[in-house]
Amino acid sequence: VSPGYDALQFAIDECHRRGMELHAWIVTMPVGKWDGLGCKQLRKKMQRNIIKIKGYGYMNPETQQTADYLARICAEVTRRYDIDGIHLDYIRYPEELPKLKTMSHDEGRRNITRIVRAISQQVKCLKPWVKMSCSPVGKYYNTKRYWSHGWNAYETVCQDAVAWLRDGLMDELFPMMYFRDNNFFPFALDWKERSHGRIVVPGLGIYFMSPREKNWPLSDITRELGFLRNNGLGHAYFRSKFFTDDTKGIYRFAKNELCLYPSLVPPMTWQ
């Protein structure tokens, strides 16, 4: 239902008025419930390009039609609005896809990279200063000492996010690092070592501090924040509600101890 105004333009204006950047969040592969309005409309437009998994629709990651469609959407947003970035979410194979267990993952990575390349080229052709980013699965791959427990970006869901940085298809990564201890620290360092001079901003699972989730203590998050700062990495929070609600005192910690002074957004020196 239309809110009666341009919601994206409103968000851009309010962010820029406060000295903040606005990155348009684009959900790529999932298209909602199979019988939902949005999924139904897409199925009419591209009947053979929407696949059904457990009652939900997904763009087929293996077709050029998917790459072209998503690239057109991102290009339209870039052309029409004064955005600072395009952020791709769920830019991966659906983990519930049965085919993932038997398919060639090299081919899968090529398919996802083809989509990312199509989007990046369209966006950069229009406005080279617009930042391309995505939120890959929190562990890129196994490290020399630590196993990813079968859940990583590179192999499990065919996200070769490091290659996207290397090849200039992405400017920033926001890996979903909703972990603790040895599931966090070595893998955060691994992202840094593979960053190719680009920006890596690990996302922290502050929602796990909620008693309704895993009831993590604040110290788990503050240790991670200290580690990231000491290693020259940024940080993001998932999700904002738990930050603004000051869950376990995270907002007060950030305001009074971690972020005492304004910080500048890192420049894209490679552009």
Spell out what each predicted region is:
Residues 30-54, 91-106, 145-152:
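Aromatic- and acidic-residue-enriched segments that line the glycan-binding/catalytic groove
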Residues 64-80, 150-167, 184-188, 215-227:
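Short, acidic/polar
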Residues 1-13, 17, 23-80:
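Active-site-adjacent "subsite" loops/lids of carbohydrate-active enzymes
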Residues 126, 131-174, 179-190, 211:
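Substrate-binding cleft/loops of secretory-pathway carbohydrate-active enzymes
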Residues 12, 16-35, 87-88, 108-154, ...:
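Aromatic-lined carbohydrate-recognition surfaces of secreted/lumenal glycan-active proteins
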Residues 1-5, 53-71, 101-111, 170-180, ...:
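The substrate-binding groove and active-site-proximal loops of carbohydrate-active enzymes
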Residues 15, 70, 77, 86-89, ...:
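Conserved, mostly hydrophobic/aromatic
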Residues 161-184, 198-270:
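Substrate-binding cleft of secreted/luminal carbohydrate-active enzymes
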